[in-house]
Amino acid sequence: MQEELVFKMVQGQIGYEFKNLDLLKQAFVRRSYTSENGGENNEVLEFIGDKVLDFAVVRLLIQKYGHIPNGETTEQNIRFGSGKELWFQNNINDEPESNQFHCDCDEGLLSRLKTKMVEKKTLARRMDELGFAEHLIMGKSDIQNKVNEERSVKEDLFEAIIGAVAIDSGWNLKDLQ
């Protein structure tokens, strides 16, 4: 019963309701637990979540700082095309329409912004705010060493939850934002 309430609370906090609740539960299972008890742990979900998080953060940065000068929004282009065909004028004296992507930030600044958004302490702080780390399912050694208090473990949990949402949602971009 307690576990059911915890995962109901987690779903409410993240704003996503799982079709397959086992995926959410797996996001909370550490390898130390599965080494002792068998089953699947959160490591692959964490790997997936790390990549999804990178994509989501880059997407947010480009929505904020990127554009195409002819007026198309980056949101339309991020969704794999605006439906408008690119064309070029035959007369070489005429200025061609610019359809090149422009970003108000250079690559270095975008990289620094992305790094700041996904750094360990940022993700760990969010897990602290939500109180999720206290619900990790761990083996005896992890419990004894209080690994659920470590930033890297909280970061792993954050990423594993995102990975679980990615799989459960069928990689739906709306759900992953």
Predicted regions, residues:
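Double-stranded RNA-binding/processing signature
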Residues: M1-Q177
